[in-house]
């Protein structure tokens, strides 16, 4: 199969992965309306072409939280990344490090903090949920700090897990799930050998380190289901500040009032996000939510955005709508599943090239030049 775009990596991942894993990363909540709108709303934003501007000195470099990024992209936290390639978190982190951008390790990663951090040169970011087990949260924060993690990404849009119906159909959950996953793996020998056998242990490294025992996929579903905390409030973030003195980014903001609260709390950044359409179906796409949030808090904290970003043009669109940096989730996991760490490196290089084309033809010589002037007026007003 010839890979020439991010969509090609998705197709290659679908061929290589057992269905339960492909649909886990590919699917969303309920009828997946928001999942679809995330991609569609971005693709419908028209860029404003400008020419004859001498774009020979174009630069993608930017700064965020005192870090220099080669382009305004970071890899998002994605649970179970280590099930998509052998020691997948390590491979993805190394690809991000090579490109000069941050990698964010999920709370529910296969590879623990202590395995990923030493594999890269730049400090990684760490993502944390609010869970009932505050002992685990404190333990994770202390370990992240000890490993040199520079930025905490605190996910707040998951007080309860979303209803992901695709998971029940695919075998990730539902009746006879373990047997269905086993049978699917038999018909995907490359994955079964490379990841299923050689990628062991398949436990949740960060949780296993705390519990002192292996935690497999069934434990993952059960432990998370019993530990999400619907009582989450701003007081929980104050508690976290007692154990984390570095930059804190609040992930899961879709409303300007919540963004203003994040400023009052003293957050260093927010992620405008609907969890990739995996939590509450029917909410606005991140692209539609972003402009009002940027109007409310731009300049008061860093604005990151995710959900629906599949290529370099989408990155430019999000920046034009008000984001300082974007997080890339599904897209890098597709590339990882299809071609390992090299696939992630190739995808990041492709996004780099796509951004350069878009910036050249919109007249933006630097990241700071990307704003609403890069968008067609009618579309800009329509958002």
From Swiss-Prot:
Localisation per UniProt entry: Cell inner membrane
Coiled coil ranges: none
Q: Which GO terms describe its molecular function?
A: FMN binding; L-lactate dehydrogenase activity
Q: What class of enzyme is it?
A: oxidoreductase
Q: Where is the FMN hydroxy acid dehydrogenase domain?
A: 1-380
Record field: catalytic activity: (S)-lactate + A = pyruvate + AH2
Q: Which residues bind substrate?
A: 24, 129, 164, 278
Q: What membrane topology term does the record carry?
A: Peripheral membrane protein
| Co-factor(s) | FMN
> Do you know which Pfam families this protein is assigned to?
FMN_dh (PF01070)
Asked if the record carries the keyword ATP-binding, the reply is no
Q: What is its EC number?
A: 1.1.-.-
GO BP field: aerobic respiration; lactate metabolic process
Q: Name the GO cellular-component terms.
A: plasma membrane
Sorted alphabetically, the keyword list is: Cell inner membrane, Cell membrane, Flavoprotein, FMN, Membrane, Oxidoreductase
Annotated FMN binding sites? 106, 127, 155, 251, 306-330
Task: State where it is primarily located.
Answer: membrane
Active site (catalytic residues): 275
- Do the record's keywords include Transport? no
Q: Which family does it belong to?
A: Belongs to the FMN-dependent alpha-hydroxy acid dehydrogenase family.
Role description: Catalyzes the conversion of L-lactate to pyruvate. Is coupled to the respiratory chain.
> What protein does this entry describe?
L-lactate dehydrogenase
Encoding gene, per UniProt annotation: lldD
């Amino acid at each position: 199969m010839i890979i020439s775009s991010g969509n090609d990596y998705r197709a290659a991942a679908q061929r290589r992965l057992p269905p339960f894993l492909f649909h886990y990363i590919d699917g969303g909540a309920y009828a997946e309306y928001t999942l679809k709108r995330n991609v569609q709303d971005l693709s419908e934003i028209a860029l404003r072409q400008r020419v004859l501007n001498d774009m020979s000195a174009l630069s993608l470099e930017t700064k965020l939280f005192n870090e220099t990024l080669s382009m305004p992209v970071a890899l998002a936290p994605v649970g179970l990344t280590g099930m998509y390639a052998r020691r997948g978190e390590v491979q993805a982190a190394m690809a991000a490090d090579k490109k000069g951008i941050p990698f964010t390790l999920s709370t529910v990663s296969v590879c623990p903090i202590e395995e990923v951090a030493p594999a890269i040169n730049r400090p990684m970011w760490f993502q944390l949920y609010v869970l009932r087990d505050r002992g685990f949260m404190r333990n994770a924060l202390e370990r992240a700090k000890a490993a040199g993690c520079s930025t905490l990404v605190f996910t707040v849009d998951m007080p309860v897990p979303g209803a992901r119906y695709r998971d029940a159909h695919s075998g990730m959950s539902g009746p006879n799930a373990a047997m269905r996953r086993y049978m699917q793996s038999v018909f995907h020998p490359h994955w079964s050998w490379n990841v299923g056998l050689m990628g062991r242990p398949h436990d949740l490294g960060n949780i296993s380190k705390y519990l002192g025992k292996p935690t497999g996929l069934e434990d993952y579903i059960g432990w998370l289901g019993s530990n999400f905390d619907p009582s989450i409030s701003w007081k929980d973030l104050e508690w976290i500040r007692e154990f984390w003195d570095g930059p804190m980014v609040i992930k899961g903001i879709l409303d300007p009032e919540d963004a203003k609260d994040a400023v009052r709390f003293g957050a260093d950044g927010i992620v405008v996000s609907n969890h990739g359409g995996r939590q509450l179906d029917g909410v606005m796409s991140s692209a539609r939510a972003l402009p009002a949030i940027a109007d409310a808090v731009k300049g008061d904290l860093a604005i990151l955005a995710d959900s629906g970003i599949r290529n370099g043009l989408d990155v430019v669109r999000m920046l034009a709508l008000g984001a300082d940096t974007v997080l890339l989730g599904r897209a890098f996991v597709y590339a990882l599943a299809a071609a390992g760490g090299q696939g992630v490196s190739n995808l990041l290089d492709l996004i780099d090239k796509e951004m350069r084309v878009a910036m050249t033809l919109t007249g933006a010589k630097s990241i700071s030049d990307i704003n609403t002037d890069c968008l067609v007026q009618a579309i800009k007003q329509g958002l």
